[in-house]
Amino acid sequence: MVVIRKTSVMRSSFIGIYAKAWDDVAFITKMADEKTVNEFREVLQVDIKRISIDGSTLIGTMIAVNSNGIVLPYGSNIDGLDGIDGRNVLYLKDKINAVGNDIIANDHGAIIHKAFSNKARKEIEDTLGVETIRTSIGNILTVGSASVLTSKGMLVNPETDDDELEFLKDFFKVSVKSGTANFGSIYVGASIVANSKGILVGRDTTPIEIDRIDDVLS
């Protein structure tokens, strides 16, 4: 049974900007307290890496990950990124560097911001080992901030139309629904941290939103 729990990171409901998860690992800002780290470990059931990127706490905005690889900003000084042998690691050199906000991926595909260069798209594709396309989701270019994707399901912002939902379902090979978190925020990627084993949502997320999130990601 997938566990879903309300929480905060550094007193913020927008937990997705401070953390990123996949099925075997999760990353969280080094500034998170021990109680928060333990909660993430318990719910997500994975090893938790406490890291900083160039001294920033905004880990979730700067990491894209699937089973094959990790994408990080070029030239970044990363503290705590160890024990991830077996994955491809790309330090992406492009005018877009908030890669966590601008890439959404699982082990079947990746969607990236339209402004990524052809070279960047190919490097991301090679690193994550999946077909990679440039497009928006629900008219939002920062696809990672406005959607949540696991190996089981995908939640996207409410502006996503039926044709897009069907395309995303076929492309990522998971169930897809639209919804909000944190009392109406369309930026669900900034509000949720999830993998196939557990779901953490921002503390302002309503019971109706939780039911929707649980339905698609569980």
From Swiss-Prot:
UniProt keyword terms in alphabetical order: Initiation factor, Protein biosynthesis
Example GO biological process: cytosolic ribosome assembly
Paired cysteines (S-S): none
Keyword Signal: no
InterPro entries in alphabetical order: eIF6
CDD domains named in the record: IF6 (cd00527)
MF annotations from Gene Ontology: ribosome binding; translation initiation factor activity
Membership in a protein family: Belongs to the eIF-6 family.
Role this protein plays: Binds to the 50S ribosomal subunit and prevents its association with the 30S ribosomal subunit to form the 70S initiation complex.
HAMAP family membership: eIF_6
Protein name, UniProt field: Translation initiation factor 6
Species this protein is from: Thermoplasma volcanium (strain ATCC 51530 / DSM 4299 / JCM 9571 / NBRC 15438 / GSS1)
